[in-house]
C-alpha cells in the first residue's frame, strides 16, 4: 500500500514537472534565428543598434557616446571630435 502511494505521488510529481517546463510556442515564430535576421536587416526593429553623437556634440567623462570615442576639452566645454 505504501509503495503504491509512493508511486502515485512520484508519477503526479513528474507529470507536474513536465507540464510546468513545456514550451508554450503557440503564436510564436518557429525559428527565432530568422526573427533575429529580420531585425538585423531592419535597424528600426532592432534594439541592439546604438546611436552615437556626431563631432561637435557635447560629451563628458561619464557620458561619452561619441562616434569616434574621442571627447576633447575645449573652451566651450568638452565636445566630440574627429579621430
UniProtKB/Swiss-Prot annotation:
Proregion residues excised on maturation: 23-50
Notes on the domains: The presence of a 'disulfide through disulfide knot' structurally defines this protein as a knottin. The cysteine framework is VI/VII (C-C-CC-C-C).
Localisation: Secreted
Keyword list, A-Z: Disulfide bond, Knottin, Neurotoxin, Secreted, Signal, Toxin
Pfam family, one: Conotoxin
Record family assignment: Belongs to the conotoxin O1 superfamily.
Tissue/organ expression: Expressed by the venom duct.
GO molecular function, one term: ion channel inhibitor activity
Lineage: Eukaryota, Metazoa, Spiralia, Lophotrochozoa, Mollusca
Annotated disulfide bonds: 52-67, 59-71, 66-80
Protein known as: Conotoxin LiCr95
GO cellular component, one term: extracellular region
Signal peptide (from-to): 1-22
Amino acid at each position: 500500500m505504501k509503495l503504491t502511494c509512493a508511486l502515485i505521488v512520484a508519477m503526479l510529481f513528474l507529470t507536474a514537472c513536465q507540464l510546468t517546463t513545456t514550451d508554450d510556442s503557440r503564436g510564436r515564430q518557429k525559428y527565432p534565428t530568422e526573427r533575429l535576421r529580420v531585425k538585423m536587416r531592419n535597424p528600426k526593429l532592432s534594439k541592439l543598434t546604438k546611436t552615437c553623437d556626431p563631432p561637435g556634440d557635447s560629451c563628458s567623462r561619464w557620458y561619452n557616446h561619441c562616434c569616434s570615442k574621442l571627447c576633447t576639452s575645449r573652451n566651450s566645454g568638452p565636445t566630440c571630435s574627429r579621430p
